Amino acid sequence: MKANIDVFTLPIEKQFMRRLIKPDTWILNGFVEDCAAPHPHVVIGSEKAAVIDTTDLFYNVREYVEKIVTDKPLITISTHWHGDHTKNNYECEDCDQYMSQRCWEDIQENRV
């Protein structure tokens, strides 16, 4: 039997597992079992870092990235409008956010 993990009570450095897939490119994995779920990717550039798909599965992905992965300013890139890819964009409202025009229109239309 697997123990349930309450991610909200974990210290920020234990809320995710990060995997370096190539230099300056990370995949963040949260505690989601038996689920085909989107995972944020972080690509670190010379001046900024991009969070690709903030998702809806993680608690405070921005805080984690800023404290554990990089101290560079962040931008977000949304691949498409589905909430499981964009819900946590609100954490980065003061960051530059990139998405297609269609994605922006779909987010506006489907905003709850």
Show where each model-derived region lies.
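Metallo-beta-lactamase
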Residues: 2-23, 94-112
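Short amphipathic alpha-helical surface micro-motifs
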Residues: 8-11, 24, 33, 77-81
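Conserved beta-strand hairpin/beta-sheet module of binuclear metal-dependent hydrolase folds
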Residues: 14-67
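Active-site HxH/HxHxD metal-binding segment of metal-dependent hydrolases
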Residues: 61-112
